[in-house]
A protein has these predicted regions:
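Membrane-helix boundary elements
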Residues: 8-48
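Terminal transmembrane helical module of multi-pass membrane proteins
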Residues: 121-134
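Hydrophobic, membrane-inserted alpha-helices
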Residues: 60-64, 85-93
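C-terminal ends of transmembrane helices
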Residues: 62-74, 122
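Cytoplasmic-side transmembrane-helix entry/capping segments in multi-pass membrane proteins
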Residues: 3-9, 74-84
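Structural signature of hydrophobic alpha-helical transmembrane segments
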Residues: 47-59, 79-81, 106-108
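Membrane-helix boundary connector in multi-pass membrane proteins
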Residues: 90-107
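Alpha-helical transmembrane segments and their membrane-interface exit regions
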Residues: 110-119
Length: 134
């Protein structure tokens, strides 16, 4: 069952955990703008990584994992259905909750949409290939 788990739920859960426990509903993105580290670059510039940047990076990595799993055919119907549920939850939360009205959460919504779309596209491709049509 762990293999049928949409890994983008991790980004969704992490975002919500932070937004609803550490965030301020009147300024939802303030907590995600906080710096969590910085790196001095060879050019002399300082690259600062915020909490929001880290969540976006995690989301992109998890989206890659999801698409690779779908392309390998290892994804199950349960995984696709849970991905659709995740997208629905993300879309509704983005529209209805002030804490979710941030650029970081929008990237999570977009990643879940891409995951669902890629799953459908790959399933259709496999089905048409199995029938011998192009």
């Amino acid at each position: 069952m762990l293999l049928a788990f949409p890994w983008l739920f991790l980004s969704f859960g992490l975002y919500n955990l932070i937004a609803f426990t550490k965030g301020d509903a009147s300024v939802p993105r303030a907590v995600f703008d906080q710096a969590i580290g910085s790196v001095s670059m060879a050019s002399g510039a300082v690259w600062t990584v915020s909490l929001g940047d880290a969540i976006v990076a995690l989301t992109i990595i998890l989206l890659f994992v999801e698409v690779v799993r779908s392309a390998r055919g290892a994804a199950s119907l349960v995984d696709h259905l849970l991905g659709i549920v995740l997208f629905a939850l993300c879309a509704v939360e983005f529209v209805l909750r002030r804490e979710a009205a941030t650029q970081v959460f929008f990237v999570i919504v977009l990643a879940s949409l891409i995951d669902v779309s890629a799953g459908f596209a790959l399933a259709v491709s496999r089905t048409s290939r199995g029938r011998g049509s192009r």
